[in-house]
Structures are given as structure tokens and as C-alpha cells.
Amino acid sequence: MERAYSPSEILKKKIPSIPFEGVWRDAFGEPGRTGVWLIWGESANGKSSFAMQLARELTKHGKVAYNSLEESLSLSFQNNMRRCRMEEARGRFLVLDREPIEALTERLKRQRSPDFVIIDSLQYTGMNYKEYKKLKEQFPNKLFVFVSHADGEKPKGSTAVSVQYDADMKILVQGY
């Protein structure tokens, strides 16, 4: 049988967080450093732009990997990086060009692997919910940020809908 905790034990526990400042703190407070976030929105509403700005902010708190499954290393991706001045985050930001989940898993097993992993997009991973859970549970000390397509105001597809229920932070992007 697993150990049970008292309320006082839980409240005394130091849970690592991201000490956002300014507009990021106003929007998200001080979220946990681990777990899952889901960003979703309709096409051309700014999901990737928002994700890149989030990546830039996260580089202040650790190492970030951005797996560009959907856009790859396209001109729009390059322009997005330029707008967010990602070159200033040298050493704390790396771009993965359509890295399969199996290769990403191997990368995350290494020492000094990224603290934060942005996957753009969930649909392009081809993962089902069981595979998503396996990835998340294999790396409990990482924060995964998945970008998802939308069907109206809901994430698109059964995996994305299930991830939405599981995610610690849920961000709908509209007209960003």
C-alpha cells in the first residue's frame, strides 16, 4: 500500500515553481516547474508565436527544448524566433527539427537535458493518450508544453481532449 500524507505534511512540502514576473506572473501566477501545459487554438491564431514567447520566458528559469514538428525550420519559424530574440537565450534554448518522440525520450534521459520541453504540435507527434501518459510519467521532473490544433474552442482529437483534462495549465489562444 502506498504511503498516505496528512494535510500538514503536504502543506510543508517544498514544491519547485517558476517565479514568473510582470505580465507572465499576472497571467499565470507562480506555476509548478513540472507537469503538463496545453496550448490550443484555431489555425493562424498565434499558438506558435505564444509558445515561442513562453519559451523565451522559460529560458530565464532553465533550459528549454522546442520540438518544431509542424513548422520544422521554415521561414515563419525563423521569423518567430527573430521576433522573440531567441538568439539572446544562447545555451538555454535549443530547437529540435521534427525530432521523433523516441529520440526525444533518449535526449531527455541524458544529464543536463532540458528542464522544459515545448512540442509543437501534439497532433504531429502521432501519440495516443497511453503514449502521452508514458512520456509524462517517465520524466516527472520535466515540464511538457504541448501545442494543439483546435476544433472550435476545444483541442482537436481524442488525445488532445484527454491531455486537456490532465494538463496543469490550459491556455486557449485566440487572435494572439
Regions found by a protein language model. Give the residues of each.
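Phosphate-binding/switch region of NTP-binding enzymes
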Residues: 137-176
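Pre-Walker A adenine-sensing motif
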Residues: 15-31
